[in-house]
Curated annotation (Swiss-Prot):
Induction: Induced in cell culture by yeast extract, an elicitor for medicarpin induction. Its EC number is 4.2.1.139. It comes from the Eukaryota. Belongs to the plant dirigent protein family. Its main location: secreted. It comes from Glycine max (Soybean). One of its GO terms (cellular component) is apoplast. It catalyses: a (4R)-4,2'-dihydroxyisoflavan = a pterocarpan + H2O; (3R,4R)-7,2'-dihydroxy-4'-methoxyisoflavanol = (-)-medicarpin + H2O; (3R,4R)-3-(6-hydroxy-1,3-benzodioxol-5-yl)-3,4-dihydro-2H-chromene-4,7-diol = (-)-maackiain + H2O; (3S,4R)-7,2'-dihydroxy-4'-methoxyisoflavanol = (+)-medicarpin + H2O. Keywords: Apoplast, Glycoprotein, Lyase, Plant defense, Secreted, Signal. This is Pterocarpan synthase 1.
């Protein structure tokens, strides 16, 4: 009797552990209908416009007191910046860079970028790439930020984005930034 009770308890324990362990399953991308992994290089221009009737970035928060820097430590900015094929403002629009950046350094001009590049044209229309990273805009001629995800054509995206100034108007604060994005995706 004790022996059969032991086996019943053991079997119930095993059954219970199997039932509770099924909240996940291991999959491969092909089981989800994804094709072979691809590597894509994107090249476009990011227009960060402070001036004019319709700026593409606005200040959300600024530190107390007067600061001599354009973006003093602690400044938070929201952006909805056009992404274009060429550096000209009227160049073909391929998407928007939407997100926030924060001034993160007390010693030099540095930003923490949190943005989604939302594409509105061509093969990648409706797809996004999520970018996160440190952007030391004055001390590094080419800055590199991580691609941490994506949607649509860029599901499971990973890679990096390189940013370099194409032109900057230090008086107004407007900037055109050239981006090269290297992304692995399915």
């Amino acid at each position: 009797m004790a022996k059969s009770t032991f086996f019943v308890c053991l079997n119930l324990s095993l059954l219970f552990s199997l039932v509770t362990a099924t909240y996940y399953s291991s999959l491969t991308p092909t089981l989800l209908g994804f094709r072979e992994e691809q590597f894509t290089h994107l090249h476009f221009f990011f227009h960060d416009v402070v001036t004019g009737p319709k700026p593409s970035m606005v200040f959300i928060a600024e530190p107390n007191g007067k600061a001599k820097d354009a973006l003093p430590f602690g400044t938070v900015v929201a952006m909805d910046d056009p992404l274009t094929v060429g550096p000209e403002q009227d160049s073909k629009l391929v998407g928007k860079a939407q997100g926030i950046y924060t001034s993160i350094s007390q010693e030099e001009m540095g930003l923490m970028m949190v943005m989604t590049m939302a594409f509105t044209d061509g093969d990648f229309n409706g797809s996004t790439i999520s970018v996160l990273g440190r952007n030391m805009i004055m001390s590094e001629p080419v800055r590199e930020m991580a691609i941490v995800g994506g949607t649509g054509a860029f599901r499971f995206a990973r890679g990096y984005a390189q940013a370099r100034f194409y032109s900057v108007d230090f008086t107004k604060g407007d900037a055109i930034v050239e981006y090269d994005v290297f992304v692995n995706h399915y």
